[in-house]
């Protein structure tokens, strides 16, 4: 019972979805169905975010260059440095491909939809999150293969215009359309914030189920032993904890407010499964792809669960701060 008090309903939903995908993964004709459903849910998420953000908020988010600069440093400098140090150290005798997999994980761009959804759930700066996460994903398509070639001795990799177009079509276009629709649906969106919050959560659950179903079908539980699996889980938790702590420290050190701190934490600590697996298919031989992306797949699940708990905690802090401000205003 104590566990259920610690974990919020959304975190329990994530665990349930992972178990569901492990025992009942999407197969056959259901695979394209869930892929299309996930795409539609993500597009709806960004449409709603565009509709509920004012023009002034978007301009302010895009112009928040100090925040964006630190998020990029966290994603493409801090993470790779930690990955290189860990791969050089090799503290445990496991398959060397697992160390390469963690190094590859650290080079990837940030995930977009969950970073923005968690920022929204926690009461952070959503406009800045949209700009930072989208920019990270777009830059990563070009920068990540270059970093792979630099630190992993893989050559002949380059960015894919098709992936750039997919990001523009699936994420930025719905956001722009939603914002352009704001004069007609803005009031309705304001009255239905709880329903929109459910849209955020549902999109994340669909991504988790679809991604983990594919991993299970590809034999994730048959490729590694329990010892290696425990190694991946522990390293993923430690890596994520280090990055989150550094991001919180730097956000406060640089003088960001609470909303911006939330954005930095959720945008600067994520790694993209959606970009990482297709990129691995291009960069690495087929025979090693499974082991290379295994740390990424497990890290992806852990980051979602950890960030769900963090989002709940930040939301409670944000609500308390707002209540204090309202109380002070009423007294004045």
Stretch-by-stretch model annotation:
Residues 193-199, 256-272, 278-279:
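Helix-helix packing/entry segments at the starts of transmembrane helices
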Residues 60, 113-125, 249-253, 279-285, ...:
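Helix-loop junctions at the membrane interface of multi-pass solute transporters
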Residues 273-332:
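C-terminal transmembrane helix pair
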Residues 24-38, 52, 63, 270-295:
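Transmembrane helix-boundary motif of multi-pass solute transporters/channels
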Residues 87-143, 148, 152-163:
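Membrane-interface helix-loop-helix junctions at boundaries between adjacent transmembrane segments
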Residues 1-93, 149, 153-258, 326-332:
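Structural signature of multi-pass alpha-helical membrane transport proteins
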Residues 12, 74-82, 107-112, 128-149, ...:
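Membrane-embedded alpha-helical segments of transport systems
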